[in-house]
Amino acid sequence: MELPFPTIAVSEGAANLLVPDVPRRKGPGTAGPWPFYNPTMAVNRDLSAIALANWPHPLGSLLDGLAATGAWGIRMALEVGAKHVAFNDRSRDATRLIRENLRRNRLAADVHTGELSSYLVERRHDFVDVDPFGPPTPFLRAAFRAAKERSGIGITATDTAVLCGTYPKACEKRYGARPLRSAQGAEIGLRILLGYCHGLAAARGRQIRPILSFSAEHFLRVHVLVESGSASDSIDHVVRVDAGRFIDASGADRGAIGPLWLGPLGDPAVVRHLQPSAWSSVASARLLSLLKSECEMPPFFATTDELAAAERHSPPRLDRFIEGLREIGYRATRTHFHPRGVKTDAPSQDIARVFRELSPTGSTGDSRPAS
């Protein structure tokens, strides 16, 4: 097949794909006049396949809404076994490449050339994937407007500098929320994205239930179920008061963050049963293990860096610190959001006490919970 750009054959998951053979760099990638493909996003597609294979109810039809090479939809067809997968992209070169990739994987599917918002006016699917180059916001209103009862939406956001606090004014303009550049920036950004999704669903008299949400590399990813229901009490503002501790706040409060989603980032009934597939990478399996360990933990976390600065003690080994919190009856685990972060339900005074006791530079006495 003749295409106006060079191509190369690659394998990803269960799929064999023809993709543009163009220079690549780390991070979100570089757009060009060719269908976009970023191999580092394989982790995204690995976790999508695992989530959709364990979705709370059967999914009859899936839409790869901004399909590019068709990698997401083809992998879902092969790995999830969806009965019907459709593809949409506004580029004719992209839809030609998608058809070739379908042929290579011995699949048949509907392939449409056009704008996603127009496509969604005419067609409905059980799950719509929105994975753009750039922010997802231009496509989300149409996606939520078209969402059927108990349908799902998967959203990838690569505008992490905006959501995670580097450009707070851009975040307020784009998502209607104030972020915070901090160790917790990725979790805050993910919760802002979910809060934005909640607002779009609420405008249609519906609510969202996050099934699986995470941060990885240079992107944020959410999978949500859209259900009927009244406004959620999971939306609020918070303010940071000390290392890893945030409390509810009014949107008018100085330093207030949000509005953002404060409910679970995933459905524990689903997440705790997820297992890597035969096609999952080592990186995906490692990420999934962390997501399972923290899926029932409260929002936000502290890092040993923050605690070391606050307590003026050298940090203990992370695993020993977690063990110390567990020994006095609290839940504690690593978090995928930060390599030195700890999620726990311990109050701040006990977090600090255990940290000081286990610090290699000194001890402050016993570590019984504070009364």
Regions inferred by a protein language model and the residue ranges of each:
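SAM-dependent transferase fold signal centered on methyltransferase-like domains
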Residues: 1-371
